[in-house]
Amino acid sequence: MDYLSHNVSENLKRIRQSKGMSLDQVAEQTGVSKSMLAQIEKGTANPSLGVLGKITSGLRIEFQ
């Protein structure tokens, strides 16, 4: 896992847990599949900018 993937993975998991949300809830709120979210959190998938946009918009967080 490269540096960027690791950061995205760790941040998504941290934010999801801090909001007390399950992967199912995040999937419903963002429009990104549960399996894709799980792969991102595990670092086995690199999300496109479009997917990152859906996640940040759905979770109401800033993309930096």
Predicted regions and their residues:
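Short alpha-helical DNA-recognition segment
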Residues: G20-A38
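Hydrophobic micro-packing sites on short alpha-helices
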Residues: R16, V26, V51-L59, Q64
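Short alpha-helical elements of helix-turn-helix
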Residues: E10, L49-L52
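A short, Lys/Arg-rich alpha-helix, primarily the initiator
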Residues: M1-S18
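Key DNA-contact positions within bacterial/archaeal DNA-binding proteins
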Residues: D24, S35-M36, A45, G50, ...
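Intrinsically disordered, low-complexity segments
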Residues: R16, G31-S33, N46
